[in-house]
Amino acid sequence: MRLHHLLLTLLFLVLSAGSGFTQGISNPLSCRLNRGICVPIRCPGNLRQIGTCFTPSVKCCRWR
């Protein structure tokens, strides 16, 4: 019975940790950790948008 609880807990941790990777970048810290920069308008030509920083108008951009 203890083994079932341990396996269920492990499964829960794996599935809950993976759910964060499906969401986009939405704050400045996660933008910087993903090697991005916050740009107040749109990303320049040699950068691509990977998320937002503060609001949807502030983009998180990274080199292509």
UniProtKB/Swiss-Prot annotation:
This is Enteric beta-defensin. Inducibly expressed in enteric epithelial cells. It comes from the Eukaryota. The keyword Disulfide bond applies. The keyword Amino-acid biosynthesis does not apply. Keywords: Antibiotic, Antimicrobial, Defensin, Disulfide bond, Secreted, Signal. It comes from Bos taurus. The lineage of its organism: Eukaryota, Metazoa, Chordata, Craniata, Vertebrata. It is found in: Secreted. Has antibacterial activity. Residues 1-26 form the signal peptide. One of its GO terms (cellular component) is extracellular space. One of its GO terms (biological process) is defense response to bacterium. Its main location: secreted. Belongs to the beta-defensin family. LAP/TAP subfamily. GO terms for molecular function: CCR6 chemokine receptor binding; chemoattractant activity. Disulfide bonds join 31-60, 38-53, 43-61.
